[in-house]
């Protein structure tokens, strides 16, 4: 079995459509940041409400995945970005290069942050999948535009580095080199460019990816309420980290029926407890506290779905940590778990499911971890993917160098 076999998709097409299984097809959109954390409360609420509406677009036929990839940039990549030229601005260019080197040694340690949204549908073949994927793509881009978010769809050439993203720190320090026209005459597939040199899944809670150590954990959402800073705090960790949120919308009618059945079952249990109380000779209003709590929460959830424009979603929250050695990996996982505990959640390393976790951490729209938490639209939206807009100029005519406020 080769490293390529651990990356389970069938093909990536030139237009960016990935055939993950014979009947499941996905596309990926890369989106940018907007100002959220620096905004006042009124603007934050407007962005949050808009993000809830964004999530409500996805019905039960569309599976989608948010991927937040933080990887340390190589020093050589900065050098290639600003090649020295012998002209009248050479001294200024050297000064700029020195500033970048100094900032790379501190601050965010040269971490490059990218955000992806991968969405997928089931279809009999690519012919029937393509027009529907294109309609969904147009709707998503328009919804991003309403939020003021810049976004673009990745084609096959651009999408190659997306699943490749966890691999460079693991095994491939060289830049990603891939040209579509090379495939026919080389006899290679896109997996040969994406896969690291090797995978080793012999341990229960971590694995090897090339020369690097890695571990996938899932977030147990135990808190009754979460802060909108939890995702930001995870992504502020100054190490290689990939956060993935897999989301599946539940059919609205089915969700309401399920909750109504739950309320009926809780009411039956309440009546049984009251009968026991009468037979025992004590106040029938005294019922187990858990029963009262669950009943109130179920009724509130039903009200949210019926009257507050909320949908029901099933969410899987995964975090992939990578490091140069086992000790550093353990420290990174410990630091990530500390943030989870800060918000009354628990981060648990997957036990003998590291390969499935690795696959689910690739932006392919494929979730192989069946650990899900039901959340409403506002519950999913609390993982706000925005902090502050990047002031970044990568053109040859860039005019200034600066540091973001956050």
Region locations from a protein language model:
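Extended, folded cores of ATP/NTP-driven motor/assembly subunits in large transport
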Residues: 1-388
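Active-site-adjacent "gating/activation" loops or surface patches in catalytic cores
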Residues: 23, 383-406
